Design a protein with these regions (language model features):
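Carbohydrate-associated surface elements
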Residues: 134, 153-156
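N-terminal subdomain of nucleotide-sugar transferases
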Residues: 1-29, 64, 217
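Conserved catalytic-core segment of nucleotide-activated headgroup transferases in glycan assembly
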Residues: 6-13, 157-238, 248, 252-253, ...
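Short hydrophobic beta-strand element within catalytic cores of glycosyltransferases
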Residues: 278-281, 288-293
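Active-site proximal beta-strand in glycosyltransferases
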Residues: 68, 84-103
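A charged, aromatic-enriched C-terminal amphipathic alpha-helix characteristic of glycosyltransferases
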Residues: 328-356
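Acidic donor-binding loop of glycosyltransferase active sites
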Residues: 126, 245, 260-274, 287
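Membrane-proximal helix-turn-helix segments that form the acceptor-binding/catalytic region
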Residues: 12, 55-59, 85, 109-131
Length: 356
């Protein structure tokens, strides 16, 4: 998922600036050369309430003379607060969403309980990193956080420039050959973990709203490629849509090929919170984006040039019109990489932490 990838890339670029030890789950077998990884946490869903971790992490902190503790998301807030009190470390909360609002948008009854816990966690932090400016403002206004303790540390992109025209053409040629797409057809892409409700809702919108509108446009030739795992069995691998310009690619080994080869990335997501990491990646690979307003939160329009069109939520007719009229020639401007390059983001984060 995008959030997990974002955490891994953040620390990859962050590690050269600090002496970093990462505490993670036992099933996280990723080989990392930039920093030390300790597989301390259980894979069980009950790991978030395991009190023994206080004693284990307290020992590690003292042995390694750790001075700062970063927690990803608020769920280990209780543990971070205890370690802050007993080990005198400076607590940093790295938020990827306002989690309570994300679960509220998904209809979870307990979102209010999480809201108060999330607030408590952030209020005990020496620094709060939010994924975009709207979340930062929310933290200041609703959680009553001090503005000088709140900063935007966004999701990033690994490269400092877009792929060449030749790279994009090669990727499109690969996709056309693999999925029998005519070279003259526009390739529309959507990807995500498909049992995650916001992504599943977006898929339903593509199938039931957007695609029928595009099919009605006689002069627009296209294929929609859906990438992602965990598609519920009820969808029958989208076989019923095979004759309706829909291609289900499933899980793909290298999604970057699809970002490079697609003409347009469509993002009809209307809930879920946070920054849509797939948009950052699509734009970074110079793919034109058509998105709902909710789906484009955290992507400043001032740095995307003509590569991203933002449509009002639920206006699917206008969404389809913009897809058909999309400019796929103009490139993503350099300002995008100034803002979203992981190296710049990590430098900002490390400077803030080192200045505590």
């Amino acid at each position: 998922m995008g959030g997990q990838k974002g955490i891994a890339l953040f620390y990859q670029f962050f590690a050269p600036h600090v002496n970093l030890t990462c505490i993670t789950t036992k099933n996280n077998a990723a080989a990392v050369k930039e920093y030390e990884v300790l597989n301390v946490l259980s894979d069980s869903k009950f790991r978030y309430v395991n009190l023994s971790y206080f004693f284990k992490l307290k020992k590690i902190i003292r042995q390694k003379k750790i001075t700062h503790l970063i927690i990803e998301h608020p769920y280990y807030g209780w543990l971070g607060i205890l370690l802050k009190w007993f080990c005198k470390v400076k607590l940093v909360v790295h938020s990827h969403n306002i989690e309570a609002l994300r679960f509220k948008s998904m209809g979870k009854w307990w979102w209010g309980i999480l809201w108060h816990y999330e607030k408590l966690t952030h209020r005990n932090a020496a620094l709060n990193f939010f994924i975009h400016d709207d979340d930062r403002e929310f933290g200041i206004k609703k959680f009553k956080l001090a503005p000088d303790k709140c900063f935007t540390i966004t999701y990033g992109f690994e490269l400092t420039n877009a792929p060449t025209t030749e790279e994009r053409q090669s990727a499109k040629h690969f996709i056309c050959n693999k999925y029998l797409v005519d070279a003259a057809e526009k390739i529309l892409l959507f990807n995500g973990t498909l049992d995650y409700k916001p992504n599943q809702d977006a898929l339903d919108i593509i199938l039931e709203k957007i695609n029928p509108l595009l099919q009605a446009k006689e002069d627009f030739n296209y294929k929609i490629i859906i990438c992602g795992n965990k598609l519920p069995a009820a969808y029958n691998n989208l076989n019923n849509y095979a004759t309706k310009n829909i291609i289900y690619a499933g899980f793909v080994d290298d999604i970057t090929v699809f970002f490079k080869g697609a003409d347009i990335f469509i993002n009809p997501v209307i809930d879920g919170g946070g920054i849509k990491t797939k948009l950052v990646e699509a734009l970074g690979y110079d793919c034109t984006v058509i998105s709902t307003k909710s789906g484009a939160i955290g992507i400043p329009a001032t740095i995307t040039g003509n590569k991203m069109k933002v449509i009002a939520d639920m206006d699917w007719e206008e969404f389809a019109n913009e897809v058909a009229l999309a400019n796929t020639v103009t490139g993503i401007p350099p300002a995008f990489f100034d803002h979203f390059y992981w190296g710049n983001i990590a430098t900002k984060a490390s400077t803030l932490i080192n200045n505590l």
